[in-house]
Amino acid sequence: MRIGQYEINSRIFLAPMAGITDQPFRRLCSQLGAGLTFSEMMSTNPDVWHTEKSRLRLAHHAEIGINAVQIAGSEPTEIAEAAKINVAYGAQIIDINMGCPAKKVNKKMAGSALLREPQLVARILDAVVNAVDVPVTLKIRTGWDKTHKNFLQIAKIAEKAGISALTIHGRTRDCLFNGQAEYESIKAVKQAVFMPIIANGDITSPQKAKDVLDYTGADAVMIGRGSFGRPWLFQELKQFLETGDIIDLSIDEKCQLMLKHIEDLHHFYGEQKGYRIARKHVGWYLDQLTPGSNFKRTFNALSSTTEQLIALKDLVKSIR
């Protein structure tokens, strides 16, 4: 599929997720088969652009593949300016967040709260598309709640504005992450517009990815929570969609991917932040590799990157 001038070589994308899709995780997922990965959501508020967190999110050196950056805000001029700044820092695709269900985001009239204001959506999309010379994409939910589903209206506004691709998470904001994703809504959008459509929600296995693509007609699928502690899922999905073959990495191969991820994470964040951020990722890996193990508690008590790597290597030796 194409997004603007870019040919994407895999139909499996990594979703933008705050606190998750930092550069080390994006690089790993790209190496394992993700055709496109999105950065963590960047606020368009200029007051926070100079923080350490923003500095790391703006770090686009050493990216693999196309550099797609997600931004979130509610003021058209501010969002357009943020898009230009990110392009200046190396963004090759700008993604606009209108799907985040978090209260702290919605209180600022950003994320999925914007779905309640279609006219504002149109102004934001027009402003950003006209501000940058890179493809602009959009991520939404199906609506604010079950009585206010306006995904078709938003999709048509997006297409008119020149949005290059639309990702739809098959839930309303009110659903958060509960219940089942409504793939029939994604199918309806695919039938109503001509731009590429990316299906998102509950895609956690190769067969599920194929079923969703077949049912909705979507051009690609986007993986979010299913990738936690399972970056090899991208390799499994890509192999299955291309050949129909199921691959299952060995425990040792998965452990080596975990070690590589944590080493890269430590290097990216440094000693003080690295060991803290590693804890959640290792917890997710352990849920896959050694469910029920007491090692998680031991690992979380460690307070240096060196101690963490020694402990992880000892664990790997014990479970091979």
Swiss-Prot record:
CDD domains: DUS_like_FMN. Disulfide bonds: none annotated. Its cofactor is FMN. Gene3D superfamilies: Aldolase class I (3.20.20.70), Putative flavin oxidoreducatase, domain 2 (1.10.1200.80). Pfam families: Dus (PF01207). Keywords: Flavoprotein, FMN, NADP, Oxidoreductase, RNA-binding, tRNA processing, tRNA-binding. HAMAP family: DusB_subfam. This is tRNA-dihydrouridine synthase B. It comes from Haemophilus ducreyi (strain 35000HP / ATCC 700724).
